[in-house]
Amino acid sequence: MTSTPLPRLILGSSSPYRRELLERLRLTFEVAVPDINETPLAGESPEATALRLSLNKAQAIAQRHPDALIIGSDQVLTLDGRQMGKPGSHDKAREQLRLMRGRTATFHSALCLLDGRTGQSQLADVQTRVTMRDLTDAEIDAYLRLEKPYDVAGSAKSEGLGIALLSRVESDDPTALVGLPLIALTSMLRQSGYPFFAA
């Protein structure tokens, strides 16, 4: 009896942090960068935004690689119900960190595993509550000069020096905060026939 070969696995992300997380699973995968509009829709909840964008990213890659299994992911940060994206500049990053100091924000880390062959998708949203230390303006500016976290939601790279900005992290998945929830992903991959610990 012959087993069906597994489809190619593609990570649809430009993030080096997500790539590093996926490498932990010791699976062979490729990386492709999706090109989509990431603007939130009017009235859309943070969870809905993150889930929609993770699906859209996977679908964009599937158009180019219809024979593959594609991982799409997105992360949306909320504070008091307000969505906060990637700052893109020093001034906006400073503003974000000033707003969050001493307070608790929620990261929605959405994940999509899309089978390009069938169009079937699995979706999950893993939430992480993060409490910031009560940082001084000088600490915020020093951190921003050192790490330049302008490409991450919330302006704090928890996988780097940004961990020193935090006083508490609450999540069901320790990898969700970095942007790729591996517990949810391994469950999805198992359902798609990917073996872990195969002899």
From Swiss-Prot:
Gene Ontology biological process terms from the UniProt entry: nucleotide metabolic process
Compartments it resides in: Cytoplasm
Top EC class of this enzyme: hydrolase
GO cellular component, one term: cytoplasm
Taxonomic superkingdom: Bacteria
An annotated Gene Ontology molecular function: nucleoside triphosphate diphosphatase activity
Organism expressing this protein natively: Cupriavidus pinatubonensis (strain JMP 134 / LMG 1197)
Active site: D74
Function: Nucleoside triphosphate pyrophosphatase that hydrolyzes 7-methyl-GTP (m(7)GTP). May have a dual role in cell division arrest and in preventing the incorporation of modified nucleotides into cellular nucleic acids.
Family matches, as NCBIfam families: maf
Residues marked Important for substrate specificity (site): Y17, Q75, E159
Protein family according to the UniProt entry: Belongs to the Maf family. YceF subfamily.
Gene3D superfamilies, alphabetized: 3.90.950.10
PANTHER family noted in UniProt: BIFUNCTIONAL DTTP/UTP PYROPHOSPHATASE/METHYLTRANSFERASE PROTEIN-RELATED (PTHR43213), BIFUNCTIONAL DTTP_UTP PYROPHOSPHATASE_METHYLTRANSFERASE PROTEIN-RELATED (PTHR43213:SF5)
Protein name as it appears in the record: 7-methyl-GTP pyrophosphatase
Reactions accelerated catalytically: N(7)-methyl-GTP + H2O = N(7)-methyl-GMP + diphosphate + H(+)
